[in-house]
Amino acid sequence: MGDLELLLPGEAEVLVRGLRSFQLREMGSEGWNKQHESLEKLNMQAILDATISQAEPIQELLINHGKIPTLVEELIAVEMWKQKVFPVLCRLEDFKPQNTFPIYMVVHHEASIINLLETVFFHKEVCESADDKVLDLVDYCHRKLILLVARKGGGDLSEEEQFQDSTPMQELQKQAEMMEFEISLKALSVLRYITDCVDSLSLSTLNRMLRTHNLPCLLVELLEHSPWSRRVGGKLQHFESGRWQTVAPSEQQKLNKLDGQVWIALYNLLLSPEARARYCLTSFAKGQLLKLQAFLTDTLLDQLPNLADLKGFLAHLSLAETQPPKKDLVLEQIPEIWDRLERENKGKWQAIAKHQLQHVFSLSEKDLRQQAQRWAETYRLDVLEAVAPERPRCGYCNAEASKRCSRCQNVWYCCRECQVKHWEKHGKTCVLAAQGDRAK
C-alpha cells in the first residue's frame, strides 16, 4: 500500500478490539464519536485493501476478535435511533442547532457500518463468524428490501431543488431520505453474500429467509420494480457509485451490478439443496417465480451462464404440482436485537431526544472546532481519492468537479458560480473545518 496505507496493522487491531455496543442515548457522545471515527478508518482501509488487491487484514481482525456481531448490533441500534429518536429531534421546536453536522454523523453511521459489512461479507468466513446475529442481519436486510420495493419511481428532484428554502434540520431530513436508498442497496449486496453461504446457514436462518420472509418472491418483485433504474427524458439511467448515471444505448443490454446481485441470490436460494428442502412452493410462490422466465433472455444467459440451471428449474416448476403451506412444529432461534432495544427504550424516545439535545448536539464553538479537526484527520483526502471509483462531484450541482474549496479542502466544485451559490449552506462547516486544520 506504500504511501497510501491508512492504518498500520497494530493500529487496526487496537481499533477493532475497542469496538463495542452503545446505548441509544449515548449516540453522538464523545465516546461514540471516537468509535465512529474508528469505523470510518477501518472502512477506508478495508476498501483500500480490496481495491488494490492487497491482503485483507480488516476482515480477519473482525473475525478473530469476534466483532461482526458487535457491528450488526450497532447497525440495528442506529437504524432504530433514526426511526424512533431522530423524528422527535426534528419536531422539537426549541431545537435550532447552529450546526447539524454532529447529528449528520449519527444519521450517516448506518451507512458507514453497512458499507463496511458489504466490503467484508464478500468472504464467507465473515458470515460464519456472525453466529446467531446473522438472523438479525437477515431481518435488517429484509426491512431494507421492503423499502426498495415500496419506493416510488426514481424521478428524484435535483439536489438544488430538494434543499431550496430548507431549514438546516429539514435539509438533514432530506439528506437522510436520500441516504436510506443507498443503504438499502448495500443491504441487498450483503443479503446476496449471506445467500452464498446458504449450505452452511442454520435451519433457523433458512426458515427465516424462506418461510418467514419468502425472500425469493420479494427478490422477484425487486427485479420487476428495478428501483435502481429509471428513465429521464427518454434516457435510461442506473444508480451506480452513489449517483444516477445515464446508460449509453450500446450498454443497455449489459447486466448492471444490482440486477446481478438479485439473480445470484435467487440462484442460491432456489437451487441449493438445503434451501430447496426448506422452501414451500405454494401456488402464490409458483406464480411469482414463473415471472422470472420472461427475464431469462439469451443476452442475460450469455452474461450469467449459471442461470441456465435456473431456467431449467423454472421449466420443471411450471409442470409441477404446488404444495400447501407447511405447518411444521419447529423450535428455532429468532432475531433478538430489534425487539430487545425496543423493549429497553419503550416510552423513552422523547426523553432520549431531549437528553441528546442538551448534552450531545448543542455543542459550543470550541467543541465544534475540535470535532472538525478530528473529522479532517479521519477523512484522509489522499486515501478517499485513491478508493473513489470516479472523479469527484460538485457539492452544489453534482456535475464532475475539478476544483476544491481552498479554505477547507473538503468540498469540490465544477465552477466558481456553484461555489458561490453553495456558500450559504457550506460556509459554517467550512470555517469550522479550516479552524480545526489551523489548530493542528
From Swiss-Prot:
Expression sites by tissue: Expressed in the testis. Expressed in the tracheal epithelium. Restricted to regions containing motile cilia.
Intrachain disulfide bonds: none
Deletion consequences: Mice neonates exhibit growth retardation dying within 1 month after birth. Show head deformation and situs invertus (heart apex, stomach, liver or spleen). Display lung lobular structures deterioration and collapsed alveolar spaces. Show mucosal congestion in paranasal cavities. Show loss of ciliary motility and axonemal outer and inner dynein arm (IDA and ODA, respectively) components without disruption of ciliogenesis.
GO biological process: cilium movement; inner dynein arm assembly; motile cilium assembly; outer dynein arm assembly; positive regulation of motile cilium assembly; protein folding; protein localization to cilium
Location of this chain's protein in the cell: Cytoplasm; Cytoplasm, Cytoskeleton, Microtubule organizing center, Centrosome, Centriolar satellite; Apical cell membrane; Dynein axonemal particle
Single GO cellular component term: dynein axonemal particle
Highest taxon in the source lineage: Eukaryota
One annotated GO molecular function: zinc ion binding
Residues noted as binding Zn(2+) 2 in the record, renumbered to the chain: 405, 408, 426, 430
Subunit description: Interacts (via C-terminus) with DNAAF11 (via CS domain); this interaction stabilizes DNAAF11 at the protein level. Interacts (via C-terminus) with DNAL1; this interaction stabilizes DNAL1 at the protein level. Interacts with DNAAF4, HSPA8, IQUB, RUVBL2 and DYNTL5.
Summary of the function given for this chain in its UniProt record: Plays a role in axonemal structure organization and motility. Involved in axonemal pre-assembly of inner and outer dynein arms (IDA and ODA, respectively) for proper axoneme building for cilia motility. May act by indirectly regulating transcription of dynein proteins.
Family the UniProt entry places it in: Belongs to the ZMYND10 family.
Stated name of the protein: Zinc finger MYND domain-containing protein 10
Species of origin: Mus musculus (Mouse)
